[in-house]
């Protein structure tokens, strides 16, 4: 019987929940730490990452569901990236899209509208991985 290689884990801060639906508030301080293997997730060890728990169903088309944990990295987004963003002061998890030089946020569920910032769009992190409990 072969044993699988052991991967070291590192604790990442769980900063609260993020709405995958209509934008809402997000916590700013760590509630706990989540052990994550940078090797398994293919994330560089020096990456500045954090974890949020998903609440809502606006990203089901991207296979991100209510209760999932998302690992996000602090870095600039590229067109098409899934991001945690503050749009006009409220946090949400959406796809970052640039059209005609203007960024907006797009849900991966047709029940939700595109979000065009009236004033401000601040990217808080770019999705690196989704973690789901088995059987969820």
Regions found by a protein language model. Give the residues of each.
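Well-ordered beta-strand positions enriched in small/hydrophobic/aromatic, beta-favoring residues
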Residues: 52, 83-85, 105
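Residue-level recognition of conserved beta-strand positions in structured domain cores
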Residues: 95-96, 107
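Compact nucleic-acid interaction/catalytic patches
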Residues: 86, 93
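Hydrophobic beta-strand signal
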Residues: 70-71, 84
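Catalytic Cys-His active-site segments of thiol-dependent hydrolases/isopeptidases
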Residues: 104-110
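Short, positionally conserved secondary-structure boundary motifs
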Residues: 1-62, 76-79, 91-92, 98-102, ...
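Structural motif
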Residues: 67-68, 81
């Amino acid at each position: 019987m072969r044993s699988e290689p052991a991967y070291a884990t590192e604790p990442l801060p769980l900063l609260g929940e993020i709405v995958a639906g209509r934008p809402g508030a997000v916590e700013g301080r760590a509630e706990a730490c989540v052990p994550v293997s940078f090797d398994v997730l293919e994330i560089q060890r020096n990456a500045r990452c954090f974890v949020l728990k998903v609440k809502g169903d606006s990203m089901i088309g991207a296979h991100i569901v209510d209760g999932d944990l998302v690992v996000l990295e602090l870095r600039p987004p590229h067109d098409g990236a899934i991001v945690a963003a503050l749009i006009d002061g409220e946090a949400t998890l959406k796809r970052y899209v640039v059209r005609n030089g203007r960024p907006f946020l797009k849900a991966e569920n047709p029940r939700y509208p595109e979000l065009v910032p009236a004033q401000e769009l601040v990217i808080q992190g770019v999705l690196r991985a989704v973690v789901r409990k088995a059987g969820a």
